[in-house]
């Protein structure tokens, strides 16, 4: 399974129709965001049965970033049962993200 690409049209459905969702708010010009991408690609292989991993381009879809208080990118927001469980700002390593997902599953 691959990292899903979200738009303003499928964002709410993705959050509300999955138990655990990790969304990377990013932009194509952002150097740290480019570093985060391969980490998420690797993470999705590990957690695809437990969580949905997705990304949303804040340049194309600024409203959701504003809605969730994203002020810097990359920002990763972990949702559990449709609610924000954790917000992580800056590049996050796979172990940190895996720990956050595992904690949300408890």
Where are these regions (language model features)?
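Typically the conserved alpha-helix immediately C-terminal to a functionally engaged Cys/Sec
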Residues: 34-47
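A short beta-strand-turn-helix
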Residues: 3-20, 62
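Conserved Rossmann-like nucleotide-binding pocket used by diverse enzymes
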Residues: 2, 26, 52-54
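Conserved acidic residues
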Residues: 57-59
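Short pre-active-site segment immediately N-terminal to redox-active cysteine/selenocysteine motifs
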Residues: 19, 26-29, 72
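Structural micro-motif
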Residues: 62, 68-77
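Hydrophobic beta-strand anchors of alpha/beta hydrolase catalytic cores
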Residues: 22-23, 53, 76
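Non-catalytic, surface beta->alpha helical segment in thiol-disulfide oxidoreductase systems
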Residues: 80-106
């Amino acid at each position: 399974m691959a990292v899903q690409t979200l738009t303003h049209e499928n964002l709410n459905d993705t959050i509300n129709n999955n138990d655990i969702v990790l969304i990377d708010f990013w932009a194509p010009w952002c150097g740290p965001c480019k570093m985060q991408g391969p980490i998420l690609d690797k993470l999705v292989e590990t957690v695809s049965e437990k969580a949905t991993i997705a990304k949303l381009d804040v340049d194309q879809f600024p409203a959701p970033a504003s809605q969730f208080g994203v002020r810097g990118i990359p920002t990763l927001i972990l949702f559990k049962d449709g609610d924000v469980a954790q917000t992580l700002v800056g590049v996050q390593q796979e172990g940190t993200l895996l720990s956050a997902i595992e904690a949300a599953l408890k």
